[in-house]
Amino acid sequence: MACNDGDMEVESISFENSDILSCRANDTAVDFLYKYNQKQALYLTIPAGVLENKEKTVTGTIPNNYKLYYRTFSDVVSSSYFCNTIYPASPQITFNSEATGGTVTIATRPIYNENTGALLRYDHQITISNLVLLKEDGNKLVESNLVFGTYQTNKQ
C-alpha cells in the first residue's frame, strides 16, 4: 500500500496468511467465499453447484460467472461481519471495488489419509488470473496470478 495525501492507496493485493471462509463451514452449498485481513477483505461470489466433492477443474470469468469485491473498512473486521443478513453499522465500508475482469479457476482434488487410504476431505484450490480492479484513484490494478487460496469441504 502507498500513502497519497493521507488516503490509503492499493498497490497490490496480499492475503497470504488469511484462510478462505464461508458462512457454511466446510460445505459445498455456498454462494460466496471470503477472506479478510485486519481492515480489508476479498469477497468472491460463485455460481450455485460449482463446488462439488469430486475431482475436477472448472473455470469462469469475472464479471460474468463470478464476482470479486475488494473492500476496506473503517476498523478491524471479523468473520461474523460477513455472515449477517444485513451488514452491521460498524465497521463501515470505506472503499469497495468490484473486479471488472479476470478468470477464476477452481481445481478440486480429494485428500486421502496417507496410512489408511481413507478419504478425508476435498480441497478446492482457487486462483484468479488477469484480475482487474479499479483503485480509488480510478487507475486499474492488475494481478496476473492471484492465489485466492484453498477451501476445504467435508467428504460427504
Identify the function of each model-found stretch.
Residues 25-30, 127:
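A short, compositionally biased
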Residues 124-156:
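Edge beta-strand at a domain terminus
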Residues 29-121:
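Surface-exposed helix/loop patches within compact recognition domains
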Residues 3, 44, 104-106, 128, ...:
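Generic structural hydrophobic/aromatic packing signal, biased to beta-strands
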Residues 8, 51, 62, 103-104, ...:
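Compositionally biased, intrinsically disordered low-complexity regions
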